[in-house]
Amino acid sequence: MRIRSARSAPLPALLLAAALAAPAAAQSSANDSGPRLRLPVEEIALGARVQTLFSTSSVDSVQPADVTIRRVYLEASVKVNAFVGGKLQMDFAGDRAVVRDAYLRLNVSPGLQLLAGNAYKPFSLIALTSDTRILPIERGALIRGAAPLDEYNLLSGLQYTERDLGLQVLGSPTGAPLGFGYAVGAFRGPLGGSVGDQSPVSLAARATVEPLQALRFGAAWSSRDFRARSGDALQRGHAFELDAEYGDYGVPGLHLVGELATGDFSSADERRFTAAQAWLGYRTPRLSRALHAVEPTFRLSVGDVDAGAPANVGTLLTPGVGLYFGGLNRVSLNYDVWLPKADENDTLHSAKLMFQLAF
């Protein structure tokens, strides 16, 4: 929902729009009176998502079925003027509110933008895709009572990706060949503030091209400091990623997403990981007034570590289907099958049913 020229909207109308997501903000008139909220901005876009997740788990140590509120996000994207904007996103699903996105964006030109604050590192197409749009319910393996290391969980657990506090330079220059885009950033890193007088830093960079309509390729690099085995010494680790995507979210037809990543699992003992993940979906045209689309999906995600791999690396298989009822509002059903590398006979299973409200 977007509120334009918010300077003149009455305060009650703004509060009602934010809480209930009314189709449009009430318009003021010459006879309006009472308290007003005056905001010196051109536009505010309010959004929210609620994801209710029913899940099962084949792990004996946990209850076989459970229900949880997976995410409750409220967000506001602000355009102050053509040069200044930003975003604030909060998650209320846990015991306390958590800031997810919080940043200022300076739009110097299409080819040069500055982003300062808490935001995703420019690494991993799958991590950068909103959880309201991803084809499977979760980006990676999530099975209660287990800690499987598939592709996404490796990258996220090692903190080569995910959100971090820092400064990014990004853009897509007008007229650049193949629709070239880039992003480069320096971040506080997972060890920030915890290694005495040292200043660890995390770095990430990503470049993308679109040689054909709906066909995109990307390459990225991420680097972070690890603790050495003894003392406060730091050792640098690196990860590299290639990705490709064909198709678009919300568009009927075939949709393919894939990425391959490799890097340092632990710089202390020089172990490396290799991982890959691929999604496949096919979205139908609109089926009825209520049911906008049905999208069968399949996901393959593999994680591996050389020389003494952890017992929880392996392969994740996820068939599923999504029912869309307009916009991003959907009901999705997934069935995760986890095949650990150490013992493929110790297969884990998890069925998931998610109800998503998003606007």
Regions found by a protein language model. Give the residues of each.
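Outer membrane beta-barrel
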Residues: A30-G189, D197-L203, T208-F217, R272-T284, ...
